[in-house]
Amino acid sequence: MKEELLKRFTKYVKVDTQSNEESTVCPTTPGQMELANILVTELKEIGMQEVTVDEFGYVMATLPSNTTKEVPVIGFLAHLDTATDLTGKNVQPQVHENYDGKDIVLNKDLNVVLSPKQFPELADYKGKTLITTDGTTLLGADDKAGITEIMVAMNYLINHPEIKHGKIRVAFTPDEEIGRGPERFDVEAFGAKYAYTMDGGPLGELEYESFNAAGAKITFNGNSVHPGTAKNKMVNAVKMAMEFNARIPKDEAPEYTEGYEGFYHLISLNGDVEQAKAYYIIRDFDHLKFVERKTHIASIAKELEEKYGEGSVELKLNDQYYNMREKIEPVKEIVDIVSAAMRNLDIEPKISPIRGGTDGAQLSYKGLPTPNIFGGGENFHGKFEYVALESMVKATEVIIEVARLFEEKE
């Protein structure tokens, strides 16, 4: 299993599937369709049935039931795209066997070092096989580890018919990282009663609570005048953006929050005297606090527009997804069965809120309750991203065990 996981994973991460928020097509980048087509071929090769990919890059496939019992159809999902934070082009995965617990030099020329001093959780991986970047790209374990684990689990079940299971559906979706994954996902065609995203982090993670999420695009329209004659005429759009940001609580940012604490996050700011554009994301687990945060953003925009004149501040505020706890708690047994599967494999479940979102958050509101299971990766979205091969083995085994337990309990 280890060899197959390593072979598939290192193949998938070399396909550049970074999504693009500025694109209006789906998938937003051609690399996602490239990987989708690769997976379609491989799904057919391992013996999956009803393998399809639509024009938008959504891959679906079926592993038929091999039991006479009436077992609910379950699904496993992972996303094709990688994050926009750092390039996913020319990913060169590095394999470090029997990790010694010390610094890993990812890139000598650029002096990029993965160090337990900065990332103390590395101590947990001593003796394991780590797959890292070369220090110039992200790795793409988010979520190609999940894709790999689903592929290997399905292949294992096909080759081990003695493990009884109901009908299993798998899906690989585009554009999750920019919040569009479920937009064109056909829940009815997928046909599962429950599903799981393999999109979590370290070993044991199990999540059924997510942020409420919104995005705020703000355009500041200034007035550029020659600085020599600018008195009482110039309006500096960049300074307007700075003034806007100064009114947001400094301690309510990602770098100062944890657990159930929400935040405002300035993703990007660019511009000049004439015009500046800022993009914020707004996150909170509590719905009332979420609404308050959006109201605060809107009130700052209104106050600045009143100060600088009509049309000086343009705000586009949109909800992205909601806390899926509300939809999963009524069927909490689907979380409990994963906990049982983990314990059967000597994994202690670590149930915590997702300080982020998965396709499952939106799918749960479309009628498909979808908790999130660990994929094994650490430090997602950056050059220090890595995954332990042994964690990928465990995630694969969890998929297999969940399928077995659903059949056993009927």
Curated annotation (Swiss-Prot):
An individual GO BP term: proteolysis
**Could you tell me the superkingdom of the organism this chain comes from?**
Bacteria
Q: Which residues are catalytic?
A: D81, E176 (proton acceptor)
User: Which EC class is the enzyme in?
Assistant: hydrolase
User: Cross-referenced Pfam families, in alphabetical order?
Assistant: M20_dimer (PF07687), Peptidase_M20 (PF01546)
Q: Which reactions are catalysed by this chain?
A: Release of the N-terminal residue from a tripeptide
The GO terms describing molecular function are: metallopeptidase activity; tripeptide aminopeptidase activity; zinc ion binding
- Where does this one sit in the cell? Cytoplasm
What InterPro entries does this protein map onto?
ArgE/DapE_CS (IPR001261), Bact_exopeptidase_dim_dom (IPR036264), Peptidase_M20 (IPR002933), Peptidase_M20_dimer (IPR011650), Peptidase_M20B (IPR010161)
Q: Which Gene3D superfamilies match?
A: 3.30.70.360, Zn peptidases (3.40.630.10)
**Cofactor (UniProt):** Zn(2+)
Cofactor info, note text? Binds 2 Zn(2+) ions per subunit.
Q: Name one GO cellular component term.
A: cytosol
**Residues where Zn(2+) 1 binds:** H79, D142, D199
Q: Which HAMAP family match?
A: Aminopeptidase_M20
Q: What is the role of this chain?
A: Cleaves the N-terminal amino acid of tripeptides.
Family listed? Belongs to the peptidase M20B family.
Q: What is this protein called?
A: Peptidase T
* The organism's taxonomic lineage, starting at the top: Bacteria, Bacillati, Bacillota, Bacilli, Bacillales
